[in-house]
């Protein structure tokens, strides 16, 4: 089975892919926010193209574990994605995923300017890998 990780940023949605064989998430692409309908259609196309069985949406909890506006948005988006596609959608705590993604990319030698186009997909990979690790622990 394949899995798609999603990092819902303010301007972009990062996507990452993994499967049961390798159990290693890798950055896939970035979707620039347009409208909710266009975003859902783009993600639905990716789910079909890669024959994804489960999507994992990052849940941006506050550091104390409480939910704010961003977490409520992620929950609503996940529910809408599941309804629109019929693909099961799970939520996963994404605290510090962007920080970890930026650190990984800097270690690989990317400049601050180059991070902008890559960090969302890398953060989606961090989220998906965390979910996979927890699932297979």
Curated annotation (Swiss-Prot):
Cellular location(s): Cytoplasm
Pfam families: RuvX (PF03652)
InterPro entries, sorted: RNaseH-like_sf (IPR012337), YqgF (IPR005227), YqgF/RNaseH-like_dom (IPR006641), YqgF/RNaseH-like_dom_sf (IPR037027)
Superkingdom of the organism of origin: Bacteria
GO MF annotation terms: nuclease activity
Coiled coil: none
Enzyme class name: hydrolase
EC number(s) given by UniProt: 3.1.-.-
GO BP, sorted A to Z: rRNA 5'-end processing
Signal peptide: none
Chief location bin: cytoplasm
Keywords (A to Z) from UniProt: Cytoplasm, Hydrolase, Nuclease, Ribosome biogenesis
GO cellular component: cytosol
Annotated HAMAP family: Nuclease_YqgF (MF_00651)
Role according to the record: Could be a nuclease involved in processing of the 5'-end of pre-16S rRNA.
NCBIfam families, sorted: RNAse_H_YqgF
Family as reported in the entry's similarity comment: Belongs to the YqgF nuclease family.
Designated name of the protein: Putative pre-16S rRNA nuclease
Species whose genome carries this gene: Anaeromyxobacter sp. (strain Fw109-5)
């Amino acid at each position: 089975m394949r899995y798609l990780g999603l990092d819902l940023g303010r301007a972009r949605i990062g996507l990452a892919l993994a499967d049961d064989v390798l159990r290693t998430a890798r950055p896939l692409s970035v979707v620039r926010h347009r409208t909710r309908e266009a975003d859902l259609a783009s993600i639905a196309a990716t789910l079909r193209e890669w024959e994804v069985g489960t999507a994992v949406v990052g849940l941006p909890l506050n550091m104390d574990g409480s939910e704010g506006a961003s977490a409520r948005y992620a929950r609503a988006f996940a529910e809408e994605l599941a309804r629109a596609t019929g693909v099961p959608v799970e939520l996963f705590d994404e605290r510090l995923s962007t920080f970890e993604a930026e650190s990984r990319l800097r270690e690989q030698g990317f400049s601050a300017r180059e991070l902008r186009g890559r960090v969302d997909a890398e953060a989606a990979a961090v989220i998906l890998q965390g979910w996979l690790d927890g699932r297979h622990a």
